[in-house]
């Protein structure tokens, strides 16, 4: 049961009834029904009176007064209040919360599982790091974000495909091949000098050694470029897959930019046939990049027709296709595979791609497909108060493997979602190892383990639980938080914001730890009361529900909930 959806539905039905009775002239849509931030304002508030007042051209307080009288008879409602400038606050009957508690324990970890996706196909593309080396910690943030988002969408009924786009074409790959060829010669015993601009990373040595072992001295840089290329990319992609596996991330599909190059002309022709490709001139760009700029006639895509800032070039000065042209081919391929709902995770430095990607998807699909681009910001990592550099070409960068091996997979996955994806994240090694409230995953896992400890230590023979015995403020507060779980799941899924799950689990854990703490000073507040087995049974019923909700939340992270702390 999503109590907020239920009340929202009751309000909508009542508005239709009032319209039929001639009390109001219009119905309201897109009004809010949420728990208030201040507990003194009731269990649920709505702004429906203010939304309706705009259409009715009346004072919101006057409308709120009319609606409050109509909402009071709802079976679920105990009390209705009006607050300036027109909010309606509702206190629900205690039986509502006890009923939700029963439902949680009936559904167990399935409480919060929804079907808003109706098995629609959705493609979630994430990581898609250039295959030039192991994943660094910034890639790890994108990997966790994409993977958990995919899990969240599955939980609400979408048919999700997790995809990795291999950027295996372009100048960076050429540089990589030259770097590996030097390591190959080094493996054969030659002295090498790594010139500026090449990749000096130690991770390339085993690849060079592998080439030497397989081909001996027969490889030549020019003649055997394709052999070196395929071996190198295969080796690095395997390395990336191993790193992602350590993070608990596995993609369903890997798509190669290099293999899609034949689709560029096909996709550009489709746009051209729609009158969306033309030869023209771009205005001089602003900023440093304009210093060497010269005006020239270019092949352009009319992306401004779809809300972009400028039209986009499809060919470079040398006649080769731009990276954007490759993007067009890739998204044409996605649409051809039946994906009309696409999500792409990119680093925040790719913010300029958002409008052009939306433009091309709209153009290729005649507005039938949609794409949502989610940007993740950087991760600041500090070691001995010194920032760790993360440049592949310098050879000195913190890898995802380094972090997972240092703190563990579950900690890494959870911490990566303790901030909204577009906010900078500080990863503090010391804090994530602490067994304290400052360590978010420990705090949540400790709540789950504490719940199971209580259930293990409770008397084996307990009467049937009667939730109506749960009446204290702390007990009801925790039940009300647990009741929010379906709403949290739905909002997080609709907004593509999995960090909301993290925030919610921390809220649940805090409410439980606080409630447990009351028993230190008040023996009657302890969960286990040897002289009151009926109340003990009711409190164990609450503890059981809490454990189900935490386990349900952690399952979205693919994190095993702990029943005991080490």
Curated annotation (Swiss-Prot):
Cellular component, GO annotation: cytoplasm
Keyword Cytoplasm: yes
EC number(s) reported in the record: 6.1.1.19
Superkingdom field: Bacteria
Enzyme class: ligase
SUPFAM superfamilies associated with the record: Anticodon-binding domain of a subclass of class I aminoacyl-tRNA synthetases, Arginyl-tRNA synthetase (ArgRS), N-terminal 'additional' domain, Nucleotidylyl transferase
Localization annotation: Cytoplasm
CDD domains: ArgRS_core
Residue window of motif 'HIGH' region: 129-139
KW ATP-binding (keyword) present: yes
GO molecular function, a single term: ATP binding
GO biological process, one term: arginyl-tRNA aminoacylation
Entry-linked InterPro entries: aa-tRNA-synth_I_CS (IPR001412), Arg-tRNA-ligase (IPR001278), Arg-tRNA-synth_N (IPR005148), Arg-tRNA-synth_N_sf (IPR036695), ArgRS_core (IPR035684), DALR_anticod-bd (IPR008909), Rossmann-like_a/b/a_fold (IPR014729), tRNAsynth_Ia_anticodon-bd (IPR009080)
Catalytic activity: tRNA(Arg) + L-arginine + ATP = L-arginyl-tRNA(Arg) + AMP + diphosphate
Predominant location: cytoplasm
Keywords, ordered alphabetically: Aminoacyl-tRNA synthetase, ATP-binding, Cytoplasm, Ligase, Nucleotide-binding, Protein biosynthesis
Similarity comment: family membership: Belongs to the class-I aminoacyl-tRNA synthetase family.
HAMAP family reported for this sequence: Arg_tRNA_synth
Assembly notes: Monomer.
NCBIfam families: argS (TIGR00456)
PANTHER family on file: ARGININE--TRNA LIGASE, CYTOPLASMIC, ARGINYL-TRNA SYNTHETASE
Name of this protein: Arginine--tRNA ligase
Gene this chain is encoded by: argS
